[in-house]
Amino acid sequence: MKINVNSVKFKVDSKLESLIKEKIEKLSVLYDSILSSDVILKLDNTSTIDNKVVEVRLAIKGNDLFSKKQSKTFDEALDNATDALKKQLTKHKGKVKKI
């Protein structure tokens, strides 16, 4: 599976990038038909503490799955996004088995 990590207006350090790849690869264990994934990291332009945004798009056969989460840290936002994608993958997997 191909994993693309993009950041908007800042450089991602290697530690965060390796964490992202590790979390996304764990999703492929749950559902093996993931073709690729795009992860976008952004800093929201607000005065609140929760200004780190993580968007994850998984390309699978048929439809793409998407999750966007905002939190205090990129790690926490990534955890929340991958948890949401796990639920979506489980639901999608159930639909595929019914067909």
Regions found by a protein language model. Name each.
Residues 1-99:
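N-terminal, polar/charged subdomain of small-to-medium soluble alpha/beta proteins
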